[in-house]
């Protein structure tokens, strides 16, 4: 069988054309239906092809077009990602040929049949995924197979190990490198932007790399980008971390566990987040980033990812097993996931909340402050010079004294500060209010629905869009009182958000005794 690195046996010459289509982490090639090469090679739509140009080669999924304005008969089109990988210019000579299936396709088929896979199987699959040898169809098959027949804990370990091996691993040359991560699903919840400066001010090394939002109204990187640059070269990032003991940056530039980013591109549209994939995704990123100690936040709530304590404990045990095998010290904390954390949902609104907490502003959301202090305290207790149970008080002193604010300002300046005034944030100018339909107590806030409304309003693409919450669980409201305000930058976004609110505001009103009980470990 010919390998992907071998020279094609039959190559057909064309000229390259950049096709301005974002195919989201999938290499796509385009041929005109009347192209002589298309007919001679026996290509079909969705065929796997190998493209060579400029001394480089990629595998791509073939799309067939009928419009010569997109691709002419003598041209080979490449999607944005594919074109960038080839590092070429329009008009460059190129060859295209039938590609052999990825070498790991046999292991994928065995997983689809329900078989248990070993270490070498996962290494092969993840290598092919990271090198973009899998089409979206093959990626979806892998994600569905590992979700339908849940991976056993040994398979999760093998998958995590393979994902770490698929990219680079950072080494900070220190015995204690800490990080904090939440499994997600809770709007707001920008605790990382408070934990990092608190922990760094204590002296612990905390290189925080985060993702952008995919289906949520904002990720940590989106919110931090309101305050500073987050897309930084790895060398610059390392200098910032060594100087300031921490950073808050986008992790995409670091090439850490690249297979995870590819898998996410199909997991999110399918709404699949199986325990095994979740554990492998989170732990591979942290280990690749050089972390030695991790605090993991698992929120529980009626509309959170985890909805019961038994489910949380099962997930905890899986995380602990894999972390132990990977020599990562792990502290799992179960937290309140019944509602959003903080008052703002959307990049600017969340940045406002963070800066208010750092500045000890009386308007700061107390739930965000308290959660961040407790998580920071758990990280500080990794310090061998700190007695167990003292972390919270140390974190609180760092925040109250202004040391956390000073550290955050130093990190912002080092990454490249952007103008931001949390007293007068630039919010979307178009607004509407959602008011209580009756008097009562807020007994439920649907995390999924309020996140959906904020996203329809334009977040995170429109950084000033989102939702400003005025009331939280357990608070009494009167009929007509504003529950939250929706901000948008464009009328169409405002209309979409209004339509979603008409179906469900995400709020439930009732009696005080109807507020759901919370199980936490704080």
From Swiss-Prot:
Cellular compartments per GO CC: cytosol
Gene Ontology BP, a term: pyrimidine nucleobase metabolic process
GO-annotated molecular function: 1,4-alpha-oligoglucan phosphorylase activity; thymidine phosphorylase activity
Enzyme class: transferase
The entry's keywords: Glycosyltransferase, Transferase
This enzyme's EC code(s): 2.4.2.4
Catalytic activity: thymidine + phosphate = 2-deoxy-alpha-D-ribose 1-phosphate + thymine
SMART domains with a match to the protein in the record: PYNP_C
Gene3D superfamilies, alphabetized: 1.20.970.50, Nucleoside phosphorylase/phosphoribosyltransferase catalytic domain, Pyrimidine nucleoside phosphorylase-like, C-terminal domain
Coiled coil ranges: none
Glycosyltransferase recorded as keyword: yes
Top-level taxon in the UniProt lineage: Bacteria
Family designation: Belongs to the thymidine/pyrimidine-nucleoside phosphorylase family. Type 2 subfamily.
Protein name: Putative thymidine phosphorylase
Origin species: Albidiferax ferrireducens (strain ATCC BAA-621 / DSM 15236 / T118)
